[in-house]
Design a protein with these regions (language model features):
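Acidic, PIN/NYN-like endoribonuclease modules and their adjacent C-terminal/linker elements
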Residues: 1-12, 16, 143-145, 156-201
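A conserved hydrophobic position in a structured secondary element of the catalytic/binding core
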Residues: 19, 56, 130, 169, ...
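Short, flexible loop segments at the rims of nucleotide/cofactor-binding pockets, characterized by
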Residues: 30-33, 142-147
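Helix-adjacent hinge/juxtasegments
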Residues: 82-102, 106-109
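Acidic catalytic patch
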Residues: 60, 103-145
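A short acidic, often aromatic-flanked loop/helix-cap motif at beta-alpha or helix-coil junctions
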Residues: 62-63, 130-136, 189-196
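Conserved glycosyltransferase catalytic-site signature
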Residues: 21, 58, 150-156
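Short, well-structured N-terminal submotif of metal-dependent ribonuclease cores
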Residues: 1-60, 66-90, 192-195
Length: 201
């Protein structure tokens, strides 16, 4: 479909929606933006009312785990902007703390995903796999939309392959996506910036 819309303009009716990493991170309050978190919660509630399904892709689960590991690393190192050299140094001088840091981040992510899998309208397992055809499709989508990260192309390819109706995100890079039978939905702030960029604000 031709352009992104805000979450609150979607009509969920026995639909299937895929949630990307940015949406999940905001839903889980990882980013600390209470306004966007509420919008994500409202979108989930609308799906429940509309008897729709929310899916979490294998790529989103992987990236969410990475976010929580990075958060645990930042906490252990007591610095937000750490480098790979910082991590290597920690692994060398305190391997036990390094291992604990990875375990903590991984466990926190697993708990967050498990809680979502037990909550309506989420499916109770990860959706989609990354196969050769997924990679080929992602490469085509990357050429088409010039995403800054190939991971974005993989997210979109998984959504397209699984024929979902909606793709929920708070990432501005998906606003230009125009794929048949797929509607991208974003938060109001992201949508406002997108419309302003188009000169329609």
């Amino acid at each position: 479909m031709s352009e992104a819309l805000p979450f609150d303009r979607a009509y969920f009716n026995s639909s299937i929606a895929m949630c990307d990493t940015s949406f999940l991170a905001n839903l889980l309050a990882y980013n600390g933006n209470s306004t966007v978190q509420q919008e994500c919660q409202d979108a989930i509630y609308s799906m429940v009312v509309g008897k729709s399904i929310a899916a979490i892709s294998v790529k989103a689960a992987e990236e969410l785990t990475g976010l929580y590991i990075r958060s645990a690393q930042a906490e252990a190192l007591a610095k937000k902007d750490f480098t790979q050299e910082d991590l290597k140094a920690m692994r060398d001088y305190d391997p036990a703390l390094y291992k604990k840091m990875i375990e903590n981040g991984t466990s926190t992510a697993a708990e967050a995903l498990s809680a979502l899998f037990k909550t309506k309208p989420f499916l109770d397992e990860i959706t989609g796999t990354v196969t050769n055809s997924t990679i080929v499709l992602a490469q085509e989508l990357n050429k088409k939309y010039s995403f800054p990260s190939f991971n974005d192309s993989l997210h979109l390819a998984i959504a397209v392959e699984n024929k979902v109706d909606f793709f929920l995100t708070t990432d501005k890079d998906f606003c230009n996506v125009n794929e048949p039978n797929l509607q991208v939905l974003v938060d109001n702030t992201t949508y406002g910036k997108y419309i302003k960029r188009l000169g329609r604000a």
